[in-house]
Amino acid sequence: CRFLLVGEQGRGDEIQFIRFAEWLYQQGAIVDVLVSEPIAGIAASMKGVRSVLASMPPGPYDYWSHMLRMPERMNLDLLMLPIVMPYIAASPHKIDYWREQIDVVSQATEPKKSRRIGVVWAGGPHTALDRFRSVNIETLKPLFSHPGTTWFSVQKGEHECDSEGLADQFDLHTLGPFIEDFTDTLAILETLDLLITVDTSVAHLAGAANLPVWVLLPAYAEWRWLTGRTDSLWYPSMRLFRQRELGEWKSVVDEVRVALTAWCGIKTTQLAAPM
């Protein structure tokens, strides 16, 4: 059968729920997806998608559904997650391009055997709950000072240049102004060791590609992250760090810093004092 899967809501929602195109493909459907323009490039990388559309096609289709109605239509339960993984991928030529660019910008400062970490600290400012999920970049300074790490901002939007003001203090490189779309961001993430981000579309991007990602969540987190968990059923490569008190990020950053120590294999006594 011919099936049209229609994106809706935010970009993160589209990235999260476009996975159902793969499920439909596994059931034997010929699947086209209608998504917002920023998502089109990564949607085109999916095995189960025949065509990626930016405007409503004339048809004909046997069936269609909005993405967020698919869980109901397929009787989804938590045991079925994550459905398929990974379901998006960066193009090899873009990965090669960005690996070369990152090598060039970091070679002067990056210490030997340093871990390369991407960072995003702010979501779209027009989202209703953005004031709860986004942080000031200054809040993350204790992470940037962690030994054995080199940082790359993949922040986009009005805050994409905030990191430039910290470049003289930390091994922190600003890539946002050079990123054209999600295919660039995904290729960059493929070259890094880890992404640390607040709850944004880039968190979904890394998770959908099954890349290591740590997400800082507000106490008032969205339904998709469930409650009381440090993992995500939607994204096996994701680790969640939750606020205990709404608006209080220090304890979250402290927890992430401790996790970085373990992840980097550095003894606590070797750590520089948080700033």
Please place each PLM-identified region on the residue numbering:
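Catalytic machinery of carbohydrate-active enzymes
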Residues: 1-275
